[in-house]
Amino acid sequence: AAFFEACGRRMASSAFRKMISVPQLLQSLRFGLVECLWITVGMTSSSDLEQIESRIVSLVKDFAFLHADDSAASSCRPIADMVAKQAVTSSEGGKRLRALLTLDSFRAFASEDVRERDFDALLDLACAVEVFQTGALVHDDIIDDSDLRRGKPSAHRAFSTGTHSEAIGHGLGIMLGDMLATASVDIADKVASKLTHGSDVVAALLNMHREVEIGQVLDLAVELNPLDDPDELVEASLNVFRWKTASYTTIAPLEFGMLAAGIGKDDARKQALAVGLPLGLAFQLADDLLDVVGSSSNTGKPVGGDIREGKRTVLLADAINAANDTQRRELIDMWEADSRSETQVKRAIELFEQTGAIERSRGRIADLWNESKTAIETLSLSEYHESLLIEACSRFVPSIHVQTRA
């Protein structure tokens, strides 16, 4: 149906209201087919999402729940089951951007026969990235002392409620995050033999783990940075984004797709960095911006969460840089306090707006997105596959956050 709709649109155009030659008709049918393929093969987000969701649940259940031959005291099984159920709950929802990018990177670079032969294995690899992310978010929520994740109680909060113990709840949250991180490696390892460059894929996954772990260390270190040097804070924050966010959000998914498509590890890494690094930075800047201009119904988290936590962000640094003396002192005093009231959260957002920090962030996002698109255009892809990859990457940079650059 999509094919005939695509052809119909072309035949309804002015060119088709005139007599055309057979070659011209065939060319238009070919373009109609390309449009159809875009709808049904390249950008099948809804179909991909259904497969990703069901497969993640299956993979997580298989790993997290005790098996029949697992020995565990009957008195302890309820807690083990609680953790396994939470593993599934924590894995539900989300945009699945990383998995979708893994699939579309593979589609953009793989030959048709490889796409058909290896898709199921690649689907599991894409799910492995999402499972890892869930584990990282569980740990992140403990570090940030967050109450909510995707509109539901964060894992450690759910455990604390279920066990009536905050200490045990935090401990179980740490173990759940570890379990999901291990599950991601297990999933990738099981499909490696079915993928081109499978051993390189597993090595890239382990490197991704390492980079995120280093990124979390650096993220905590940034919180000790003084606020009187906003330029240094910007540099340090962007460096954290590279390690903690871009590494597994954009760089690794692109790299996995390229490796599985048959590209050698050195070229895959170089190309994934060229496209994925600016894209990942833009994504995190957009996420930070959403924290102050979004809504809790969209994010699943309260607006101004970073402000409440007193996080040192690029937005904050840009605001301090552009503020007058009074505004600068007000911002620094807020962030140096032990906590911030709801009135102060609203005031901080006002100052971000008044100092131009929000527009500065939109400008950064636009520049980084243009850098990523330019890198894609150098990859010698066909017009169709280049468009596919650009569209896949555009999911990470919602248009609301990108201002037009002259």
Across the structure, where does each feature detected by a protein language model lie?
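Divalent-cation-assisted or electrostatically stabilized phosphate/pyrophosphate-binding catalytic cores
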Residues: 149-177, 229-246, 296-322, 336-337, ...
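Aromatic (phenylalanine/tyrosine) cluster motif
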Residues: 3-4, 16, 31
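C-terminal charged capping/lid subdomain of soluble metabolic enzymes
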Residues: 347-406
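Active-site alpha-helical segments that house and flank conserved acidic catalytic motifs
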Residues: 122-147, 206-213, 255-258, 267-297, ...
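Conserved N-terminal diphosphate/IPP-binding helix and adjacent helical/loop segment
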Residues: 29, 33-129, 134, 138, ...
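Hydrophobic, low-acid, alpha-helix-prone terminal segments
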Residues: 12-13
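Detector for the Zn2+-coordinating histidines of canonical Cys2His2
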Residues: 6, 24
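All-alpha helical catalytic cores of prenyl diphosphate-utilizing isoprenoid enzymes
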Residues: 69-76, 90-98, 174-182, 189-293
